[in-house]
């Protein structure tokens, strides 16, 4: 199985399976001299951690990350700092319940990677999905914490859930402070309360639903990215598409641009006191694959969780028709915990872009 590494100069390789003894990552290309401890990474992992509300999987994992290499401390440093060597990260799995999957070991869950993994590799770890499980994203979040350190305090990466099922937020009520006040990372308190009832009904029905996550990055200077095949927006889109269950990505106005007229979609410019000023941001902070200095705006759609208790038709490994219902502990809406993962993927792309920009910029 190849392609477990993400990035160019700032690279992250993840390893491990949902029900294995541990999961981990190796971060390569991190500059030396950056202060780094586990406490810098843990807050981001706590946001993604399972078992935090009744609206996510009840699997109880503390997700305590350990830094095994790549940092050093002595009397000349103010705490551990990165050395430039690969940084190894590890999280132990402590609450596996593999017996929950014995009934589906030879059946393919509709909408899941079971079928394609079997067809490609001839073998799959059916316990929680193995490598295809969203459990792997914990290591992306940990690595994303390191990427944020590389980016520095001048760049802010925030994300929110803006739609669950067919119920979207009211953008006139958007409040970033509200995101940390509810279990959905929702910027609209009124809609978050409605989602509570929606999710309770879904859980009782044994079903699931999809969602849309919006990521907003502030502070990226003009000039990051490259034309043609290394466009900043194409790399952000590709990064979001690597997240489990993501089926669509848009930048700025995205698909809504198709309904606009040219004079409306183009972001007009004026000269301000400190330089050029854009009058709108329909292009999501990127033109020609290069950042404009405006906010980067990315949205991605997450399909409903495939593991549900509703009985469905499928095939087994002998290509015999059968029915399946998936027991175990699953997210009724995987989009909720995808919010911190979306932030992490944006951080990984931008840390890589920062290092690449340093070698290509005219300024």
UniProtKB/Swiss-Prot annotation:
Its pathway, per UniProt, is: Metabolic intermediate biosynthesis; chorismate biosynthesis; chorismate from D-erythrose 4-phosphate and phosphoenolpyruvate: step 7/7
Q: Where does NADP(+) bind?
A: 48, 54
Cofactor(s) this protein requires: FMNH2
List UniProt keywords, sorted A-Z: Amino-acid biosynthesis, Aromatic amino acid biosynthesis, FAD, Flavoprotein, FMN, Lyase, NADP
Q: In which domain of life is the source organism classified?
A: Bacteria
This entry's Enzyme Commission designation comes to 4.2.3.5
Cofactor binding summary note: Reduced FMN (FMNH(2)).
- Provide the assembly information: Homotetramer.
Name the chain's protein: Chorismate synthase
**To which species is this protein native?**
Maricaulis maris (strain MCS10) (Caulobacter maris)
Q: What is the lineage of its organism?
A: Bacteria, Pseudomonadati, Pseudomonadota, Alphaproteobacteria, Maricaulales
Q: Which gene encodes it?
A: aroC
């Amino acid at each position: 199985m190849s392609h477990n590494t993400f990035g160019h100069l700032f690279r992250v390789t993840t390893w491990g399976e949902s029900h294995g003894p541990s999961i981990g990552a190796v971060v390569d290309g991190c500059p030396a001299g950056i202060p780094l401890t586990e406490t810098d990474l843990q807050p981001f992992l706590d946001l993604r951690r399972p078992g935090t509300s009744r609206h996510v999987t009840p699997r109880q994992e503390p997700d305590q990350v350990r830094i095994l290499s790549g940092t050093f401390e002595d009397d000349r440093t103010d705490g551990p700092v990165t050395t430039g060597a690969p940084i190894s990260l590890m999280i132990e799995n402590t609450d596996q319940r593999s017996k929950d999957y014995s009934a589906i070991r030879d059946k393919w869950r509709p909408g899941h990677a079971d079928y394609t993994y079997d067809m490609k590799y001839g073998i799959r770890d059916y316990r929680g999905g193995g490598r295809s499980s969203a459990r792997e994203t914990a290591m992306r979040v940990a690595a994303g914490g390191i990427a944020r350190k590389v980016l520095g305090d001048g760049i802010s990466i925030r994300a929110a859930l803006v739609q669950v099922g067919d119920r979207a937020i009211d953008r006139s009520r958007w409040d970033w402070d509200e995101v940390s006040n509810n279990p959905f990372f929702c910027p609209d308190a009124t809609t978050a309360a409605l989602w509570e009832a929606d999710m309770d009904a879904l859980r009782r029905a044994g079903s699931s639903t999809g969602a849309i996550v919006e990521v907003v990055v502030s502070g990226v200077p003009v000039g990051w990215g490259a034309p043609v095949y290394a466009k900043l927006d194409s790399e952000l889109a590709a990064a979001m598409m690597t997240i489990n269950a993501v089926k669509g990505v848009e930048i700025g106005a995205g698909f809504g641009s198709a309904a606009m007229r040219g004079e409306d979609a183009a972001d007009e410019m004026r000269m301000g006191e400190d330089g050029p000023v854009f009058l709108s941001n329909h292009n999501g902070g990127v033109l020609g694959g290069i950042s404009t200095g405006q906010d980067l705006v990315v949205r991605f759609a997450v399909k409903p969780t495939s593991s549900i208790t509703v009985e469905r038709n499928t095939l087994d490994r002998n290509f015999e028709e059968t029915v399946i219902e998936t027991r175990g502990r699953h997210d009724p809406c995987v989009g909720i915990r995808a919010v911190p993962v979306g932030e992490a993927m944006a951080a990984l792309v931008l840390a890589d872009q920062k290092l690449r920009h340093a070698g290509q910029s005219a300024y």
